[in-house]
């Protein structure tokens, strides 16, 4: 098992490395808004690049950030930060960034997908690096304002200047990540592990596990409302325990009956066949097959995603969950 021996913090980073440089943040969604505001509040020169004037444009202005059309934002930028969705980045790069960017400008990413799978091929004279916060944009902003920060990953793809790591850590400091800690990785490792996590547990795995457990109980004649509470609703409480106290803390917090049942039946359900399928899923990611299929799917208007989402929305568990929302919310304590 490989492990990093280095975690970068505030003492390893210096904002002076990028002071005076113009930073163009492309996109003003969840991450873009948080990054732009945090970098601005850290005393850095930030503009936002958007493809069109609309809600994001007006929101940036109301936040005190200068919005520009992407072409105008990148032409004078020393550092260009891609914070638009993965599948938008290649078109944005080809049409609005590459033809207009300044020679030698840095390219920064929050996810390695487009670089790792060569959907974007950067100029040879640009530093290319990644800062990947391990939390959603609103949390990145909230923690920064409170004096904290969300941990992040850092990776260097091209280091033409010899100072790419220093600049990457300065960006990380600017968004507050070095207050917590920044772990070195590679574009390859970040991309493959991120996709794997999404597919086998965070989205795909947990969704299918909840669905299978719920449907098993209902098919055996149990009330769907009771099945929903036992297989879906209670998951949040346990995930919160894992987040706060780790897996050991979660196991210690549940009943002895739950401990025994979980430790015996858990391995029966998540068996070697499941682990084998996980490795197969990982190989699809590593080989580039998943990326190839996803690019094709996106180009066709995402029919698999649209159809799958429709099935989820029309499922019994979703209907029961919607019916129980009022009941669940009713029991929550009122905020003072």
Curated annotation (Swiss-Prot):
It catalyses: (2R)-2,3-dihydroxy-3-methylbutanoate + NADP(+) = (2S)-2-acetolactate + NADPH + H(+); (2R,3R)-2,3-dihydroxy-3-methylpentanoate + NADP(+) = (S)-2-ethyl-2-hydroxy-3-oxobutanoate + NADPH + H(+). Residues 5-185 form the KARI N-terminal Rossmann domain. Mg(2+) 2 binds at residues 194, 230, 234. Pfam families: KARI_C, KARI_N. Its cofactor is Mg(2+). Binds 2 magnesium ions per subunit. Its EC number is 1.1.1.86. Keywords: Amino-acid biosynthesis, Branched-chain amino acid biosynthesis, Magnesium, Metal-binding, NADP, Oxidoreductase. Residues 186-331 form the KARI C-terminal knotted domain. Pathway: Amino-acid biosynthesis; L-isoleucine biosynthesis; L-isoleucine from 2-oxobutanoate: step 2/4; Amino-acid biosynthesis; L-valine biosynthesis; L-valine from pyruvate: step 2/4. The active site is at 111. It comes from the Archaea. GO terms for molecular function: ketol-acid reductoisomerase activity; magnesium ion binding; NADP binding. GO terms for biological process: isoleucine biosynthetic process; L-valine biosynthetic process. Mg(2+) 1 binds at residues 194, 198. Belongs to the ketol-acid reductoisomerase family. This is Ketol-acid reductoisomerase (NADP(+)). It comes from Saccharolobus islandicus (strain Y.N.15.51 / Yellowstone #2). The lineage of its organism: Archaea, Thermoproteota, Thermoprotei, Sulfolobales, Sulfolobaceae.
């Amino acid at each position: 098992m490989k492990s990093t021996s280095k975690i970068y913090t505030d003492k390893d980073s210096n904002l002076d490395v990028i002071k005076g440089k113009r930073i163009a943040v492309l996109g003003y969604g969840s991450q873009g808004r948080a990054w732009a505001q945090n970098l601005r509040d850290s005393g850095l020169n930030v503009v936002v690049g958007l493809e069109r004037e609309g809600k994001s444009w007006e929101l940036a202005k109301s936040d005190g950030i200068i919005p520009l059309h992407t072409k105008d934002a990148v032409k004078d930028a020393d550092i260009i930060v891609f914070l638009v969705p993965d599948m938008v980045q290649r078109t944005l790069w080809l049409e609005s960034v590459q033809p207009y960017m300044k020679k030698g400008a840095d390219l920064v990413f929050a996810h390695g997908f487009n670089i790792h799978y060569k959907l974007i091929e950067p100029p040879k004279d640009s530093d290319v690096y990644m800062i990947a916060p391990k939390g959603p944009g609103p949390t990145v902003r909230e923690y920064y304002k409170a004096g904290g920060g969300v941990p992040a990953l850092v990776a260097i793809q091209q280091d033409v200047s010899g100072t790419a790591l220093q600049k990457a850590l300065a960006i990380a400091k600017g968004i507050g990540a070095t207050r917590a800690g920044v772990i070195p990785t590679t574009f390859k490792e970040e991309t493959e592990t991120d996709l794997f996590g999404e597919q086998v547990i965070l989205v795909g795995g947990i969704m299918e596990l909840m669905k299978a457990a719920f449907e098993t109980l209902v098919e055996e004649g149990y009330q769907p409302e009771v099945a929903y509470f036992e297989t879906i609703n209670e998951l949040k409480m346990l995930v919160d325990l894992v987040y706060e106290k780790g897996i050991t803390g979660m196991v210690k917090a549940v009943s002895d009956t739950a401990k025994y049942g979980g430790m015996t039946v858990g391995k029966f359900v998540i068996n070697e066949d499941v682990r084998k399928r996980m490795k197969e899923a990982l190989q699809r990611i590593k080989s580039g097959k998943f990326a190839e299929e996803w690019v094709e799917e996106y180009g066709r208007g995402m029919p698999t995603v649209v159809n799958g989402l429709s099935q989820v929305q029309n499922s019994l568990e979703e209907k029961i969950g919607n019916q129980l929302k009022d009941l669940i919310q009713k029991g929550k304590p009122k905020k003072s």
